[in-house]
Amino acid sequence: MKKLRYVHLNLLLLLLPLINLQFPTLSLAQDYDEPKKDDTPPPGLARCNGVYMSYSSGGREKLYPRTTNATAQAWSFKSTAMIVNTGIEEVKGWQMFVGFHHREIIVSATGAVSSDGDFPVDATNGTTFIGSQNTDLKTSILTAGDYTQISTNIEITGTVFGGKGTATPMPKSIKLTNDGWQCPAATSKGGTMQVCCKRNPKFKAKEKVKTKFMPRQHGDLNIIYDVLQAYASSYMAQVTIDNTSPLGRLDHWNLTWEWMRGEFIHSMRGAYAAEKNTLECLSSKAGQFYGDLDFSQVANCQKKPIIKDLPAERKDDNVTGKLPFCCKNGTLLPTHMDPSKSKAIFQLQVYKVPPDQNRTAFFPPRNWKIDGIVNPTYKCGPPIRVDATPFPDPSGLQATTYAIASWQVICNITKPKPQAARCCVSFSAFYNDSAIPCNTCACGCKDIDTDTCNANARQLLLPTDTLLVPFDNRTLKAKVWAKQKHMAYPKKLPCPDNCGISLNWHLNSDYGNGWSARVTLFNWGNNAVEDWFGALDLGKAGLGYENIYSFNGSRVPPKNQTIFFQGLPGMNYLIGITNGTNPARDPQIPGKMQSVISFKKKNLGSLNIIGGDGFPKRVFFNGEECELPKYFPKKSSGMRLSGIRFLPSILLAITTFHAITDRLLTGV
C-alpha cells in the first residue's frame, strides 16, 4: 500500500508542469486573488500638454474636543495632490498653489514643503507647495518617461474646521504660480479637482542665468545662509539679512532657528547669543562627543538659540566685530532711508556631531523666525538650497570666490489679525466735531481684566481734543460727550485699544482743486522711537499728493498711491509719554508729532473726499500695519465746505514745526 501511494505521488509531481502549461490561468487564480492593477492615467493627464495638477480629497475624522457648534468642530483630513510635467519644457522650482478656504491647518506633506513656513502651516487663505527633494520637473522626453523625475505626489495631512458629514471640503482652486504659466479654472468631479496649465505665449521672460539649484526668490526679508569654510567636524557659516521691502523695518531684531542634528555654535562674530548655559552643553550629545572641549568658552548649545545684533560700540572689536554691515544694535531700515542700515551680517563657527563627521555634511537650521519691537510680523519659509553665493576675492585681485554651499530663507510681512496689531488709527474731520477713536482692543486685550470692560463693544465717540488724553482719563469725558450728543452708551464700557503707538488722521479741508489732511503721531510708551517712519495708502487719491509740510515725504513706487513720510533730519525722534505739569492732578502727555498734507484733484476724475476717498485704506508705522476704524466721520447736514479752511492748516503746520524744534532744542 505504501509503495502504491509513492507511485501516485511521483505521477502527480510529473503531471503538475503539464497542467500548468495547459491551464496557466488556473494556477495564477489559485495563487493570487488580487485584481489586476489599472495603470491607465487620468483622462486629464493624457490630454494635457503642459503641467498637469490634481487634488483628490480623502475621508476625515472628527477630532477632540467634540462640540455642538458645527463651524467650530475640528476634523483631521487626508488628501493627495499631484503635479506632472507633460510638456516639452523643464519646470524649474515648481510652485503649486492650493486654495484652501476652510481654516485648514496643514500638519504634514510628503514630497513637498510649504512656502509659508514649517509645518504646521495656517492655510486659511491657501498655501503654496514647493518640492522638498524633487524641486524641478524634468521632461518625459529627456527621462524616457521616468515618473520619479517628471512628477511629484504630495500626501497631505491636516486639520479642517466646519462642514457636515465625512467628506473633506475641496479647495477653491489649484494652479501653478511660476512666472510665465497660466492656468484655467480647475474642473471638479466627485472628490477630485484637476487642471492643465500651459505656457503664456505673451509672457516675455527675463534673461536668466542657468542655475543648478532652485532660483533665488524675492521677499520682504531675504536671509542667506552661506557655508564659507568646511572641516570634518565643523564649518564656518555666514548669515546675511537683507531688508528688501520699502515699508519693512526691524528694531532690536531677534533671530531664532532650530538645529535638527545636534549642532551647536562654538563662536560668533557680528552677533551674539542671548543665553549661554555651560551645563546645557555638557549634558548634550555634543558634550559626550567633545569630551575634552572647554564648553565654558562656547557661544551657545541651545537647540533653538536666540541671536541678537551687537551694539555699535563693538563694530571695531577685533574678536566680535570688524564685519561689514554688523553692529547696528539690531536696526534694519528700508534701503531708501539708509542703505547702510538695510543689511546685517554675522558669522558663526558650527560644530557637528556624529554621524555628520565629514567635510560635505551640511544641514542648515530650520524653523527660522525673526521679530523686533513695534515692527511688522514676519513669517519665514524653509531654507531652500540655491546656487553658491559669489564673493569678491579677499586678496583684492579681480577674481570671484564662491561659498561652499548656500541656502535662502524668505520672510514676508503678514497682515495683523483683528485685535492683534501694534498700532492703531483714529479718524476725525472738519465737518464733524466727534472723533472716531481707535478700535476696542486694537492691539489686544490679553493683559487687562475684561470683566470690567467690554472687549467687543464699539468705542464711544469723543471730542477731538480728548485724543490727547490717556484712555484711563477719557471715561468721564466720553460719557459727558455722549449725553451732549444724545447718544446712548452701555453700562459696561468698551475696553481700551492698548496700543503703544496711535495715529490720528484728520480731514482738514475739501475744496475745488484739492484737499488737505493732518496726521498726528502719538507715542503712549515710555521709550522714545528713533528714526521712525510712516506710510499712508490712499488709493487713487494718493496720486494727487502735493506736499507734507513738517515731515519728509515721497511716493512709494510703482503705484505711487502710498505716501512714505519720516521726520526731518535731526527731528526723527518721537519721545515717549511724560508727566503733566502737576502729576498729581494732570494726566500724562504722549509724545506727539504732526504735519499737514496737501493734495491736488487734477486729472484724477471724480473723488469723493468726504465719502471715503479722503481717508487712508492702510496705515503703517515702522513697517507694522495699524488697525483702522471700521467707519468714517459723517457729514453734518447743512454744513458748507470752504477752501479758506486750508490757510489755517498751513499756519498750524508751521506752528507745529517750530514747537517741535523748540522742544527738541530745549530737551523738554
Swiss-Prot record:
Tissue-by-tissue expression: Mostly expressed in flowers, stamen, anthers and pollen, and, to a lower extent, possibly in roots, stems, leaves and siliques.
Any Pfam family: COB_C
UniProt membrane topology term: Lipid-anchor; GPI-anchor
GO cellular component annotations of the record: apical plasma membrane; side of membrane; vesicle
Lipidation (GPI-anchor amidated serine): 636
Signal peptide (from-to): 1-29
Compartments reported by the entry: Cell membrane
Glycosylation sites: 69, 125, 254, 318, 329, 358, 412, 432, 473, 552, 560, 579
GO BP: cell wall organization; cellulose microfibril organization; pollen tube growth; pollen tube guidance
Coiled coil stretches, renumbered: none
Propeptide residues according to the Swiss-Prot or TrEMBL record: 637-668
Domain of life the protein comes from: Eukaryota
Annotated keywords: Cell membrane, Glycoprotein, GPI-anchor, Lipoprotein, Membrane, Signal
Record carries keyword Signal: yes
Function: Involved in the deposition of apical pectin cap and cellulose microfibrils in pollen tubes. Implicated in pollen tubes growth in the female transmitting tract of pistil and toward micropyles, via the perception of ovule guidance cues.
Similarity remark: Belongs to the COBRA family.
Name this protein carries in UniProt: COBRA-like protein 11
Gene from which this protein is expressed: COBL11
